[in-house]
Amino acid sequence: VTINPTFVMGPGINPFGTSESFDSFNGFLNGDYKIGLPDLKMACVDVRDVARAHVKAGFIPSASGRYIISGHNSAFMRIGEILKKLDPSLVIGEKILPKWFMWLIAPKINSTRKEIATSIGYPFNAVNLKSINDLNMEYLPLEKTISDWLCQLKES
């Protein structure tokens, strides 16, 4: 059995952990997105759902093959909206930054122009039906993932 999670989000064992998801999330909290957000669409999953999927895959005898573990097809803008609702004091832009602008600043934001050209503005949807059907996965709501993560980071 192979477990393939999408963009992993949510509270961690160590609130000071480092990962791409922690860096992205901290960008919302630190004001990195105050002028606007990239048109970045992605599939994402709560870290606790990833852990549950691993356990279920290990204990369900019929589990086999590859499982896409993904709770939601979402976007940076949606994450920003949820955070703003949870904490109105956060300074998060409410508009989508143009792709050409993202392309220009790519080197300054630890990205490449190729990454911007191939990821910004394109939908990315993951299909999780096999994990739901075979592993009986029930994914946590995106709002809970973000709320719990925000609470953990504020407490640390």
Regions found by a protein language model. Give the residues of each.
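NAD(P)-dependent short-chain dehydrogenase/reductase
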Residues: 1-41
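Mid/C-terminal beta-alpha module of Rossmann-like enzyme folds, strongest
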Residues: 53-113, 142-153
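Conserved C-terminal active-site "lid" loop/helix of NAD(P)H-dependent oxidoreductases
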Residues: 47, 105-136
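Glycine-rich Rossmann NAD(P)(H)-binding loop
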Residues: 10, 37-40, 67-74, 84, ...
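Hydrophobic transmembrane alpha-helices of multi-pass solute transporters/permeases
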Residues: 125, 152-155
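Alpha-helical substrate-binding/gating segment
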Residues: 26-67, 71-72
